[in-house]
From Swiss-Prot:
Quaternary assembly: Component of tha CCAAT-binding complex composed of at least php2, php3, php4 and php5. Interacts with crm1 and grx4.
GO cellular component, one term: mitotic spindle
Organism of this sequence: Schizosaccharomyces pombe (strain 972 / ATCC 24843) (Fission yeast)
Record gene name: php4
The name this protein goes by in its record: CCAAT-binding factor complex subunit php4
Top-level taxon of origin: Eukaryota
Cellular compartment(s): Cytoplasm; Nucleus; Cytoplasm, Cytoskeleton, Spindle pole
Motif (Nuclear export signal): 93-100
Coiled coil: 73-111
Induction line: Expressed is under the control of the iton-regulatory transcription factor fep1. Expression is repressed under iron-replete conditions and induced under conditions of iron starvation.
């Protein structure tokens, strides 16, 4: 009976005799079976991988300070680099400035001799300078024209400019409606003076010395082209003209219009003007008596 024992009984008897062993976890090829959790608790799983989420340590105050210090050091290094570059450029510019100052001193010391030599060798051409002066005088006008005391010259027609005053040679114009024949008498300076009658004298010369001083300084001003022969701009307000000046200007304008509208009278056939010839005319030669016969 003892020999006929089942193998299960033999195993039980053999296993009961040694020390108890820990249970072993069998590993499969595809997955690992985790141990059974304690009752009443759920494991912290990640929603994406269905695995346990790792717990990251929170950054403490020491780590934040270390990051700020690293950034500050980087910025400080950049600033130091830029300061070094600027100092280097400043030194180079100072050296260039010293070199240029030395060259300028040398050139100022040597320039008077060169100028004297060049002035002796090179001489301006008189013909070219005359042509240039002629061209400049043709298109440039003086600020104060060289004229008589009471003479003012303008480029505007005198009948349209109420501020234009005649000079010493033509101070007065006499107008007489009764006289028909007018005689023109040449004046000393070459201008024509019309003398008809002592009645209705019109004096175009300002007698006020203050007005003459303003004319000399500012020139003749009008509303069309500003102040002629003066450096004052157009925005400067000109002096108000008196009532006499307005009357004189209107009279001149009326005279000009009436001269244009007057009919032209034909006095006869026109005489062609011929230049005088220098050839001798033998018809006008008079006989000359000899001295011997008279004696």
């Amino acid at each position: 009976m003892e020999s006929s024992k089942s193998p299960s009984e033999v195993e039980k008897s053999s296993s009961a005799s040694p020390a108890p062993q820990k249970p072993m976890i069998r590993v499969s090829k595809q997955w690992v079976v985790p141990p059974r959790p304690k009752p009443g608790r759920k494991p912290a799983l990640d929603a994406l991988g269905r695995r346990k989420a790792p717990i990251k340590p929170r950054p403490g105050p020491t780590s934040a300070l270390s990051v700020e210090e690293a950034k500050f050091r980087v910025r400080e290094k950049q600033y130091q680099d830029t300061i070094g570059k600027l100092q280097k450029e400043n030194n180079e510019l100072l050296e260039q400035l010293e070199m240029l100052q030395a060259q300028l001193k040398n050139s100022t010391l040597d320039s008077p001799k060169e100028v004297e030599v060049n002035s002796e060798v090179v001489k301006p051409d008189s013909a070219t300078t005359e042509n240039e002066n002629r061209y400049v005088n043709q298109y440039n006008y003086p600020v104060e024209p060289p004229c008589a005391k009471n003479a003012v010259y303008t480029e505007i027609p005198i009948e349209l400019d109420p501020h234009a005053f005649l000079g010493d040679s033509a101070k007065r114009i006499r107008v007489d409606s009764d006289s028909k024949d007018a005689k023109s008498v040449p004046s000393e300076n070459g201008r024509i003076r019309v003398s008809m009658s002592p009645q209705n004298e019109i004096n175009f010369t300002p007698e006020n010395p203050a007005v003459m001083e303003k004319i000399r300084k500012r020139g003749v001003c009008n509303s069309v082209e500003g102040c002629l022969y003066s450096g004052s701009p157009k925005s400067v307000k000109r002096v108000r003209e008196s009532e006499e000046t307005k009357v004189y200007a209107q009279l001149l304008i009326d005279l000009h219009k009436s001269s244009k509208s007057a009919p032209m009278l034909k006095a006869g056939p026109s005489i062609a003007f011929k230049l005088p010839t220098m050839e001798p005319n033998f018809n006008d030669v008079r006989p000359v008596t000899s001295i011997s016969s008279s004696s």
